[in-house]
Amino acid sequence: MTTAETAWTEAMKYENRHDPYRFFDELRKTPVVQVADKVYVVTGYRELLQLAHDPHVSSDISKSPISAQPAADAQPDVGAEHMAAYGREPSLIVSDPARHDKQRRQVMRHFAPPHSPNVIPNMAADIQTLCNDSLDKIKAGVNGPGGNTFDVVDDYAYPVPVAVICQILGVPLKDEPTFHGWIFDFMAGADMGPDAATEEGQARQQKGKESTAALTAYMADLIQGFLTEPQDNVLSKLVNDKDGPDGPMTPSEAAANAMLLLIAGHDSTVNTIAHCVLTLLRNPESIELLHEKPDLIPKAIEEVLRLQSAVQFFPSRSVTADIEVGGTVIPAGSAVHLLYGAANRDPERFPDPEKFDIQRPDNQHVGWGRGVHSCVGGPLARLEVNIALETFLRRVENPRLVVDPPPYRVNQVFRGPLHLEVEFDRITG
């Protein structure tokens, strides 16, 4: 193996999930580098932005040389398991214009400005209630035996965004334990590293495929119900929209995009809340600063998004023509991974990149992606994380980490703690 191939393989290993960044630093010595046959990774900030806006970079998973490759065949060169989660039809995240543009317009028409400017702001009160309810349950000892400790992931970061996205989409919250298990299985099975070739990894993949099929069938049944009896939620509106310029989505398109939003609600937002708490507790002086100046909380969140990108990269992209970037020519037909987590720590763009600096100037990170595939749910996620973090800081007195580093999830793309145990003096209110 070359040095780059070794660094990439190490970054993908589960044992390094808590800190892949030292291997990203090694890769960044050549900001665009080949790490496997027909697979290139991009770690430089400038180079990533160039490719994020290049029309010759395709997100159509069917064009990627790794889209149908079994995980056991090669170490990190796999994308099929990730793509399987987005239904029988490709969602907007694995599509190119014009399919992507049409689906994005259809989703945004019912989810965000200009057509639906109040959907996200109107969720603020509900989000605040969910945050308070979660802390009240912890305070009352509902979620476990005595002692002033709780799991930030299971008891706080998870319940809030999942309840919100279910309400927006029209997914019954009573079904949450079932589809939570399906999504967990899928994400654990979508392993892009060498561990996927082990017996345990193969078992995770098989379970992930079975759970993906179950989730797909569940979404199909839910959508069929909305076609029969339309309701006031985004998913129902997507398949019943007769007034929009693009018309309704097909049931399979709606299922694919609903699964995308549901998975993002389960993982990227949950991981961001957990990483905010983890980062602040690793930097206790920052908690004092935010107590004194709570108006800096949004800037603190953006700095966490830089340090701990909600999505580390996405495995569907490929190039449709030879592209020269960063002194390297990426041949047409190659897969290309834009490593947001690495670009956000590029010292040429962010001075002292390992430092957590709440007041960092010009923090134009790529934690939510860039280009046409920038995160659809970014405004909602920012609102959720802002309220969750403000409430945590206001009500949880003297929080301390119990274990550092915490255990992490298997998945490399949606990287986040599996659990985050926190000890505290008391919960106020």
List the predicted regions and their residue ranges.
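Cytochrome P450
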Residues: M1-G429
